[in-house]
């Protein structure tokens, strides 16, 4: 188990080491990031397959929309048109695939949320980390989340069996901080337990370095995420 986790860690570190050159200024790196995100938005549909030929990710060509249009659509994105709303202040793009069962977080709520995710490196053009595998089946990401008058905060709950995100990035930064990009959807989706009629919340995100992990921030690296959110049982 330790070896497999170390291999995953090394893969992430190698990816970041190739993300920028020592002689690049921060301004150059941000320009490179903007170009990479623009190219990702304009690219042809992206399909990632696992070694068995099963689809990991299928991302049709993205159709960005404004916050104004997003709000006019009851804070939803049209998945049939592959709409992603751009939050201009942060540069985050978000698609709500499913709003999910349950209710939105209210003031005073404090919940433990289970997340499953894929993380795709936009600069590296490859899958970086994921916990949607048999190996991580019993180790999802667990978030301790609270809402204080509309301000939502979250931290990773590592426990004795931490998930892939915590193992990779917590090990390199000694931090339980949740990327700000992961928290944004919690203002729009419902949090509950899956039932026979409704699925749990599912979103897709493009997260620039300033809203990502500490490693993404230090390397000026943008990432694409697909994340599900489910309330944990008491």
PLM region descriptions:
Residues 1-20:
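Sec-dependent bacterial lipoprotein signal peptides
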